[in-house]
């Protein structure tokens, strides 16, 4: 077993054209001192002046949280642990079901623009879609937001073919399915394991969305136009009796943001990824 662990992280990307975070892991055996310590550096040039003795080790806690919690001081960690047991604070899971967004198996095929929708007469088998983080604006997703996305030529519709015999489909719908098969869209793993590759499973309209990957701050958005989302966002269905507006107001504060930083992970390029 390792007695001491040193982690070195970087503010800037280390490898050109690769937007992934790099962490240097140093493990040491032996000695009486035990714990973990973290050094934050701007870039590789900082190794020239790095002094490992300037930062002491913290006691390693064997808990479920990610190691990013060791970025905070002992006093800050004590405050965070106090908040966890404070009955004035609750978890999202106390108010609703949280699930990943729809896994289409092929977003390019199942998420379409208005132009493609019109070409294959797909309007009656599509749902308003949030396909990317750039589709979300503000704390509500409304019909006006959806209309703007459509006008901008975004893939703002999800194809949701019905679970009825194929012979009952319109000729235009059959044509689009044939187009997918001719171009190999049905060969991907997620599509190939379905009974009918062109029917997307687990489609339901959520009450709210929680953005999976965030740049400025972790977005929580209420659904105001019966939209659905791909797995770029998480979807929330509130329990009966829960007021979504109150949950929305309660979420946007510094404490919530602090917990998303601690529980989430750095995806690279300054992006924070949050998983249910």
List PLM regions with ranges:
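Polybasic, glycine- and aromatic-enriched phosphate-binding surface used to engage nucleic acids
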Residues: 76-276
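Signature of N6-adenine DNA methyltransferases within the class I
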Residues: 1-108
């Amino acid at each position: 077993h390792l007695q001491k662990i040193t982690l070195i992280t970087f503010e800037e990307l280390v490898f050109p054209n690769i937007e992934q975070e790099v962490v240097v892991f140093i493990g040491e055996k032996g000695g009486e001192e035990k714990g973990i310590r973290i050094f934050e550096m701007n870039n590789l040039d900082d190794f020239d002046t790095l002094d490992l003795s300037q930062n002491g080790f913290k006691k390693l806690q064997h808990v479920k949280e990610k190691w990013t919690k060791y970025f905070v001081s002992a006093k800050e960690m004590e405050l965070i642990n106090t908040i966890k047991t404070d009955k004035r604070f609750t978890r999202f899971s106390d108010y609703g079901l949280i699930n990943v967004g729809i896994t289409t198996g092929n977003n390019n095929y199942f998420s379409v623009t208005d132009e493609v929708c019109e070409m294959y007469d797909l309007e009656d088998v599509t749902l308003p879609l949030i396909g990317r983080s750039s589709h979300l604006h503000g704390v509500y997703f409304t019909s006006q937001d959806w209309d703007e996305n459509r006008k901008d030529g975004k893939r703002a519709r999800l194809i949701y073919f019905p679970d009825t015999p194929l012979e009952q489909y319109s000729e235009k719908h059959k044509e689009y399915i044939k187009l997918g098969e001719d171009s190999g869209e049905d060969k991907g793993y997620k599509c190939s394991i379905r009974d009918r590759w062109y029917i997307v499973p687990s489609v339901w309209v959520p009450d709210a969305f929680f953005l999976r990957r965030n740049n400025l701050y972790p977005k929580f958005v209420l659904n105001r136009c019966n939209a659905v989302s791909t797995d770029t966002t998480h979807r929330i269905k509130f329990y009966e009796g829960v007021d979504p507006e109150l949950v929305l107001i309660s979420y946007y504060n510094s404490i919530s943001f602090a917990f998303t930083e601690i529980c989430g992970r750095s995806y690279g390029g300054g992006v924070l990824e949050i998983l249910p």
